[in-house]
Amino acid sequence: MENLQQIHIDGKEYYIIDSIQNLRAEDSFIYNKNKLAMFDGAGEARKYVGSYIGSNGSRLSDFFAYTRWGDTKIAGKRSYPTIQQGNCFFSKTNLLKYLFDARVEYQQQEQIYHNDISQYYDDYLHTINSLSSDLNFFSIYDVSDFLENKLSRAYIRSDDDIWKIWRKIVLPKISYLSILKLIPIKINNGNTQPLFYFRIFLDYQFRSIVHPQLTQSIIQPSSTESKVAERSYNRRIGADMFRKKVIEHMPQCPFSKISEEKLLIASHIKPYNICIKEGQEDQAIDYLNGLALTPTYDKLFDQGYITFTDKGHLICGTQLSAYTWEKLNINPNAKSKMRIYPEDREPYLDYHRRFVFQDNIDDFV
C-alpha cells in the first residue's frame, strides 16, 4: 500500500488503488444545449465506459466490483441493477476548475455548436457555486447493451442531481472523465468500502490558458502588417534571450540530469500567452519564470501533470498510471526536492499550482 499514490479528500487521506482515465465525453452524452452543430438528437443520460467483454470487461468488473454487465433482463424486461450505491462523488472544486478551464471555449467557441453556449456559462457557474457541499455523492446503475448485443458496450447512469449537472456543463469531444478508486489510509469502524471520485477535465489545447482564441486575440486585428512583423521580431529576440538566461540560471534538467543545451527547453512556469494577454511582457521574458527541462518533463510540467511547491518539492498529479510514473523514473509519493532554484520564483510557481496544474492542489498540500 505504501507505494500507492495518496490524496487528501475532505480532510481525510486516501490511497488511489486504481483509476480509469480518459473516458471521452461523446456528443451523444451531452446535454442538448451544448451539442455540436454536426450532430442531432437530445443526448442520452448514460455514459459509455468501455466494452464489458474480454480484458477490458474484466478490468471494469474488478474496478467497480460488479460482474452483471449486460445481464439485466428479468422476465424478458430490462432491470437496472445498482453498480455502486452512494459511494461515487463529484467535487465542487473540480467542477469549478473545469468551468474555469473551459471559460474561453464557452465564450469564444473554437468548436461549432448548435447554440451560442456563452449564454449558459454564468448560469452553470452559479449552479456549481450553489452546491452546499464540496463532495456530492451519487449512485450508479447498469444500463449496458444486453448480452445478445454483439457490441457489448458497458454504460453507467445515475438519477441523482449531480449527474444531471455534469451532463449540462461538460463540452463534447474536448472533455473527458477520470475516475479514481480510493480507500482510506486509516480504517475507521472496519469500513473498507471504496469511494469512486469522478472528475472532468478539458483537453490541454482548449484550456483557457492556451486556447486558440486566446492566442489569436494577442494579435489585434487593427495592427498594421508592419507593426505585427515588428512585434513578432521583438518577441522572437525576447524568446532567445529568455531561453539563454533560463539555461544560464538552471543549466541542467533536474529529472534527466541532462545539461546538453541543445536538448533543454526553457519552459514557462506562468504561460507565455497569459503574460502577454495580461500586458505583462516583462514576466514573459523573466528568466525566473522559466525552468530548463528536457522534452518529456517539459510536457509533464507545461500541461499540468506535475507542479512544484515554493521550496521546490515535486507534486505529481493523479492522471497518469503507476506504470507511467515508473517508466518516467518518478515516485509520485516521494515529494522529492528538485533542483529548480525556487528562490524568487514563488509568484510564478503559485500561478502554476493554481491554474496550470490539472489537479486541485489542496488535495496534495
Feature locations, PLM:
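OB-fold ssDNA-binding interfaces and closely related basic DNA-contact patches used
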Residues: 1-122
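Short, flexible coil/linker elements and helix-boundary hinge sites characteristic
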Residues: 111, 129, 215-216, 246, ...
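Conserved active-site aspartate in kinases
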Residues: 268
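Extended, solvent-exposed segments with strong compositional bias
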Residues: 97, 104-158
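A boundary/linker detector
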Residues: 136-157, 161-239, 260-263, 338, ...
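A detector for short metal-coordination/catalytic motifs
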Residues: 231-242, 248-249, 264, 272-365
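Short cysteine-rich clusters marking metal-coordination/redox-active sites
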Residues: 253-256, 294
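Assembly/interface hotspot detector across virion components, adhesins/toxins, and nucleic-acid enzymes
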Residues: 6, 182-185, 306
